[in-house]
């Protein structure tokens, strides 16, 4: 008879351990409810001990820096490998609650501990249980880390980071608006040149994730459709999954800088090329900014535009702006020249007018001076001048009606006396004189004087003498009904001209006959 050894009794069960194991199982089933089968999520940062990535996507550049504590190992949230394993980056988030919009690659240790305690454990809450399906531990721990940073130290660190990038790399950090879409704003600024295009970038990214859901769903802890719907909100932050999707979508590497001159992470696309990467900077574990290279145009690269040359549009616009500026300057100069020419012409006209006015005034002064100078003349000229002056005054003092009534039937005695009175010799002599002393001929037969040709009154002497004589004569003697100054002056001038011509003829005959007698 064979005696078999007795089995050892099982050790007494530990109620706490059983509770923990049962709680862990419940948490695992709860966290996986409705989720796709997936591999373990990758850690947030790359470490030397991580396995190599699969063949689809090139691995991110491993960096020794760490922006957050390393992920926890063990259980379903242990470190694993995946295409996003190397180069996984924490999200840009400002969420303070369990239901935040940010998501990262690793499980939250705090979440696992809270869930493993079970729903009836002390310290557990429905909010913590409801948020257990989110993808990133930063949704729970970012607020605590942010509050622990000293504002002065953070400001100095930001200043040093910006200065180091500009001095060593020549890059400029372009600030993005802090509204939850900073990652998409930074990418939109790099691709479209306008951060307000972040909604378009977000939509394209979410559509790309949905088309490749069989691949990207392996790196999301929650239901993938729920994750995509949450990420479509404009105030929901992005993380490393969106970076990888945008790197593949635009076929441009995505470089992430965090307080250093070398990128701490690089996300590569499916195909390698020489295109300029999309550069973003990560600040205080909560915010992304755009890093711009001012010496190289990158806007439009990755949009699939045929025959597109970065910066060509800017060069064309610059040439057009320069040409427009030159044309405007030329037109302005031409307008100024026209204004100056117009002013010059107006100035010349004003000067000429002023000179003419002054010359005319000077001529009037000279005429007045010459008229006031005493004239040297013979006795005949003096008597003729006196008679002419008295006759002119008397003639001008009488009105035309008085002059016309001199020969009217109302004064027959005066008319007869005037008709019987012979004209004076001086008047007879003056009738034979030429009307102007400037006319050719013997102008100095009766009166000689140096100032006779220049005096303005000399030319009036014949007219004055004629008027003195005509005022004593009746208009009927000349076949006129009444005296008319214009007709009388015309007739007198005609008679004077005829007498002047006769005098010239006589003087010519005398000159011709004088040589014969000699």
UniProtKB/Swiss-Prot annotation:
Q: Does the keyword ATP-binding apply?
A: no
Q: Where is the composition biased (Pro residues)?
A: 39-53
Q: Which reaction does it catalyse?
A: Thiol-dependent hydrolysis of ester, thioester, amide, peptide and isopeptide bonds formed by the C-terminal Gly of ubiquitin (a 76-residue protein attached to proteins as an intracellular targeting signal)
User: What GO biological process terms does the UniProt entry carry, in alphabetical order?
Assistant: protein K48-linked deubiquitination; protein K63-linked deubiquitination; proteolysis; response to lipopolysaccharide
Keywords, A to Z?
Hydrolase, Protease, Thiol protease, Ubl conjugation pathway
CDD domains this protein is in? OTU_OTUD5-like (cd22752)
Biased region (Low complexity) positions are 116-125, 377-390
Its domain of life? Eukaryota
Q: Which GO terms describe its molecular function?
A: cysteine-type deubiquitinase activity
InterPro entries for this protein: OTU_dom (IPR003323), Papain-like_cys_pep_sf (IPR038765), Peptidase_C85-like (IPR050704)
Q: What is its EC number?
A: 3.4.19.12
SUPFAM superfamilies assigned: Cysteine proteinases
Q: What class of enzyme is it?
A: hydrolase
Report residue spans for region: His-loop. Answer: 282-287
- Give the residue ranges for region: Variable-loop: 231-241
OTU domain location is 171-294
Catalytic residues per the record? 179, 182, 287
Q: Where is this region: Cys-loop?
A: 176-182
Region listing for Disordered, in residue ranges: 1-79, 105-144, 371-450
The family classification in the record reads: Belongs to the peptidase C85 family.
Q: Describe the task this protein carries out.
A: Deubiquitinating enzyme that may function as negative regulator of the innate immune system. Has peptidase activity towards 'Lys-48'- and 'Lys-63'-linked polyubiquitin chains. Can also cleave 'Lys-11'-linked ubiquitin chains (in vitro).
Query: What's this protein's name?
Result: OTU domain-containing protein 5
